[in-house]
Every structure is written in C-alpha cells, then in structure tokens.
Regions:
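Short amphipathic alpha-helix with an adjacent loop that forms part of the alpha/beta core around
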Residues: 37-46, 120, 310-316
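Structural beta-sheet core signal
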Residues: 9, 51, 79, 166, ...
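Short, basic, low-complexity termini and linkers enriched in Ser/Thr/Gly/Pro
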Residues: 41, 109-117, 269, 425
Length: 603
C-alpha cells in the first residue's frame, strides 16, 4: 500500500513499537516500522518519525542509537520513553537512573499555557501510563519543559522551532488519558494522509495470503478455542477457501470447563469443521515435576507440534505441502522478544524453538500477527462473527497450565521489614510477602518476583491502587500485590507453600473455580465490562495440599497495559463465598496489580 504522507516508527525494542504503529493507523494515518540502523534516505520518505520505547538505558555501552542527522531533516520527530531519553542525550541533555522509577499511572502537570501543539486540548491532571527506570534530568539547548508528573520532571518537552518532541509516558496505550489526542496532534503536525482502516487491512491481507500460499499448499490451523485463532481460521478460509484449511483442536487437559463441544457447534454454525483430539494424558505426563514458567510454556509448545505431526500422519496428510497456521497476535511476539532490541518477558507456546525453526523455513503462516486484541475483534466482526463471540475474554493458548503456579520463592526478613515500614504509614494496612513468584514486566524487561498480600480494612479501591503501585515501584523484589478480601488481619495467618502438580486433579480444581467465577460475573452483568478475568491457582494454604485462588479482573484494550477492575464489594463477597465452598481451597485473593509491573497472566 503506497501512501505518500506516512509516519515511521523506529523500533528500539520496546513492548510498544508496533502498538504505536497500530494506534496511529487507528487514527487513519498509515505507519511502517523501521530499524534504527536505516540509511538517512529511508527516513526522508516520511512526513513524521516516532522513536519508540525500549528496555535499554541510553547511557549504557552499546545501547541502540540513531544518527543525529535525523534531527536536521526538518521532519517532525516524537520520542516516547527510551526514544525521548535518546533525543535528549544525543542533543546534549542528561539522562540518569531514576530514584524510584515509575510503573503505572501518573498525573500530568502542565507548565506551558502557550497553546503547545502536541498537548492541544490538554488541561492538566490527565492520567498517563509510565514504565521507566531512567529519567531526563537536564534538557538540551533549545528545549523547554511542557509537562511533568510527581516523579518525572520532564514528562513532556519540545523544541518548537524544529518540531522535535519528547514524552516520558506511553501515549500509545489505552490507559493514558488523551493519549490518542496527543498522537492525533502529532499526525496533524506531520500533515500525514488519513486513508488507513481495518477494512483496508482485510483487503490487503487476503491478497497477501493468496500471494504467499502457493496453489498446491494447504494450511493446518491450530485452533485453541479463543478469539485469535478463530479469527485467523476464518481469515485463512476466506482467502484460500475452506477446503484448503484444516482446523485442528488439541484438548490438552487444561481447557476451560465444558469448552470443546460448544466450540465445535459454534464453528459448525460458521461452516467450519473442527477436528478435536484428546491429548490430555500426554500433557499431564510431560508436565510431571515441572514448575518453571518458561519450561512449562516450551513443553506445551513442543507437545502441540508433536500432536500435529501425529495427526498429519494419521489423517494421511504427509504427502501434501502443508503450512502451520497460528493465531499469533503482536503482544505474543513482543513478550517473546520478537523485535531486535526487545527483552523476553515470557516465551509464548507458539514461539518455542521448534516453531521458530518452522517460521525461518517459511512453513508458518500467522495472518493476524501484526494486530492487537481490539483490532482482532474488529476484524472478527468484519468477517461475520457475532459480537458476543468476538467479545469473549482472552484465554491463553497453553490453557490453564499458565494459571497454575508451582515455583516457591522465599523472601528475607529484611524484605518484610521494608514492607512493614511503608505500610505502617497507610492507615491500618498491613501485608505479608507470599512465598511464590510470578512473571511481570518492569521498564520493558522481564521481572520474576514475589507478591505481597494486604489485609482488608475496607480501604477504597483508589487508595489500594496507589498503595499497590507504590509497593511494586519502590521495592524491586515485588511485582504484584493482592488483597485478602474481608480479612482484617494477615499477620497471624499461615501462608504455607503447599506445592503444585500440573495434573488432572489440580486442573479440575482450577477449572471448577474458573467456572464458578465466570458464572457469577455473567449473572452480575459485568462480563462485557471486564476485559479479562484470569482465575489463578496458587500453591498457598494453611495446611498441606491446600490451594488458593486469585481473582484477576482487568480493564484493557490491547493487552499491552491493564489496570485492575474495581469490583463492587458485594459481588466480591459472593464470589469469595462460593469459591471457598470448593474442597481444597483455603484463601481467595484479589489482584490489585496493574500492567506494568505485573503481566495480565501470572505466568
């Protein structure tokens, strides 16, 4: 698609490079992703350039950089997070390690009332989303401060004469209020064309699939039951014809309760035939004694491939030229370290080594790999899926196995004393560090740290949000905070690590809890208000073999950022009461963690 006035996003390896491009496209301007090592002539083709965030520090040796001649082209430039810091450093400013870092929401304070073009229609007090450990402490000559936050002195800066801008927060994520307004303002500054839309993506993607898949080739599509793989399946069928796409669902033993048959019926109503194979015993056997989240994901990914190979042989498909179809979306590739400078947050099951090898050999097709969840849903509607279907909560490809935590992680007495010292100033709140670790993301890097549980003294959600954000920002050994609802005291409770077996017994336990929670959310009419609600099984109890449940309701749009859903306490009490009726469950926790620093899934 050739558009004259388009915007380039230079990828420095952050989780958000492609999300920036996606957001700009949603505003109607076409974007393309470029590396930071392009010749100057490549950048000259664009009407605007955005430098993305990234996991490195600009003052580190060998950190990614870009030619300073870029700033002499007369093209508007916007730096976001790492990109902002890089502009400041290259042009003579100073960047240093931040005292505390900022992860999550912050409030903007404006310092300019001169009608700054980038912050047009901002009034001050807007919430923005931070994710940084470094900060600018001195501006280059010619730049002025436009806005700050409580912990960031230079949240927005500009050189108005050269149209060079820097922002420390992530305007591209849905949790930055007026983030789209800021990006819209930048598009206007650039004078970019406004001709992009999801319908255009569909037309181009169909053409691309037809050109990529040879006439003699067919696609073996792994369908998980989620929205992503279903939309991918429909898109491939539309482009190639249903006779060239074989849908295959592997029952791993870690699917949701009563999911397989309704899924087959739903796809049949869309004229899609789905072959289902029960491989649960193999998955259970292969995961015996496994606990590390990365190892679990890789085992699941490899087992999917082995099951596919057996099916190909048994269905006598070996003699054809087959491609593997996957419902990969962009956050999957980003969290797996899918761009040049990005860090692996967690390896997705469709990014294990064996599948990477197939990708390199050109034997994998992923038709929606450049889209985000909200765009996938829009595409599903365009392809004829019901709104109820595309609005289903996301479910991880590996299934419940990534919601069953098994790694013990002890903390020190000094760590607990630090937590106690802070919470002693928080109006009756107290906390304990739980002996279990979960995956998170801080400053675009993977974190693997402990969780703090807080007592419940009927503190309002806003205050709990503030306290949870401070705990995860201030203490490097913490990346997640949970509440123990309706329990005024946690100091005298026993939180014992009880171990976890990735077997049918434990998966049945989680399946039942998940089903109870989902039914109550539907009953309350909140299913469509909550973007996703993972129910997590923890190896935490008072007695041997007891387990606990974590409720993780979040609000999001694209899965790159999220905040916890402030549930009404009456409903929370009902959910807790019903879940505790399940034999073997000791505690019910409520997750107060935003993303960042915690990923939506615990592993």
């Amino acid at each position: 698609m050739e558009i004259q006035k388009k915007i380039a996003v230079v990828d420095f390896g952050g989780q958000y490079a492609h999300l920036i491009a996606s957001r700009i496209r949603r505003l109607g301007a076409y974007t393309e992703i470029l590396s930071n090592e392009e010749p100057l002539s490549s950048y000259q083709k664009y009407s605007g350039i955005i430098l993305s965030g990234g996991p490195e520090s600009v003052y580190e040796p060998d950190s990614p950089t870009i030619t300073t001649k870029l700033f002499e082209l007369g093209i508007p430039v916007l730096g976001i997070c790492y990109g902002h810091q890089l502009i400041m450093k290259l042009l003579g400013g100073v960047v240093e390690r931040s005292g505390t870092g900022e992860y999550g929401p912050a409030s903007l304070e404006l310092h300019s009332q001169n009608g700054n073009s980038l912050l047009k229609n901002f009034v001050g007090g807007e919430q923005v989303w931070m994710n940084h450990a470094d900060e600018v402490v001195k501006l280059p000559e010619g730049f002025s401060r436009i806005a700050s936050s409580k912990d960031c002195g230079y949240a927005v800066v500009e050189n108005s004469s050269k149209k060079i801008f820097g922002i420390q927060f992530h305007a591209e994520v849905s949790h930055s209020e007026k983030g789209s307004v800021l990006l819209e303002n930048f598009i206007q500054i650039c004078g970019a064309s406004r001709t992009w839309g999801i319908d255009q993506f569909l037309k181009e993607k169909i053409k691309e699939i037809q050109e990529t898949v040879k006439p003699e080739q067919k696609v073996f599509m792994l369908v998980s039951g989620g929205v992503d793989s279903t939309v991918s399946y429909l898109l491939l069928c539309k482009a190639l014809g249903a006779e060239r796409v074989l849908g295959f669902l592997i029952d791993t033993g870690f699917m949701r309760k009563g999911e397989v048959l309704p899924l087959q019926e739903k796809l049949k109503s869309q004229n899609i035939h789905l072959t289902v194979r029960d491989e649960s015993n193999l998955f259970y056997e292969s995961l015996i004694g496994k606990s590390d989240p990365e190892e679990k994901r890789k085992i699941v990914g490899n087992l999917f491939l082995e099951a596919r190979d057996r099916a190909v042989k048994e269905l006598d498909l070996e003699h054809g030229d087959w491609l593997l179809g996957q419902g990969t979306i962009y956050p999957d590739t980003i969290e797996s370290g899918g761009t040049k400078h990005s860090h692996t947050i967690k390896t997705h099951h469709n990014r294990v080594e064996a599948i990477q090898k197939l990708i390199e050999e050109g034997k994998v097709i992923e038709p929606i790999r450049d889209l985000y969840k909200d765009e996938v849903r829009d595409l599903g509607l365009l392809l004829g899926l019901e709104r109820e279907w595309v609005g289903r909560h996301p479910f991880p490809g590996p299934g419940l196995v990534v919601r069953m935590l098994a790694v013990e992680k002890t903390s020190t007495d000094e760590d607990q004393k630090e937590i106690d010292s802070y919470l002693s100033t928080q109006n009756g709140l107290s906390g304990r560090i739980l002996p279990v670790a979960s995956v998170g993301v801080k400053g675009d890097r993977r974190s693997y740290a402990n969780c703090v549980v807080l007592n419940d003294v009927e503190t309002d959600w806003k205050t709990l949000d503030r306290v949870a954000t401070h705990l995860s920002n201030q203490f490097s050994f913490i990346n997640r905070v949970v509440l123990l609802p309706f329990e005024k005291e946690v100091k005298n409770l026993t939180f014992r690590f009880t171990g976890m077996h990735l077997d049918k017994k434990c998966s049945d336990l989680l399946r039942e809890a998940d089903s109870v929670v989902e039914s109550l959310i539907f009953k309350a009419g909140l299913y469509n208000q909550i973007w996703q609600m993972p129910v997590v099984l923890l190896p935490i109890g008072e007695k041997e073999n007891e387990k606990s449940i974590v409720l993780r309701p979040v609000e999001s749009q694209e899965a790159m950022t999220a905040n916890f859903f402030p549930m009404k306490r009456e409903l929370l009490k009902e959910i807790k009461t019903e879940v505790l009726k399940i034999p073997g469950i000791r505690y019910v926790f409520f997750d107060l963690t935003n993303k960042p620093p915690g990923t939506i899934e615990w592993e």
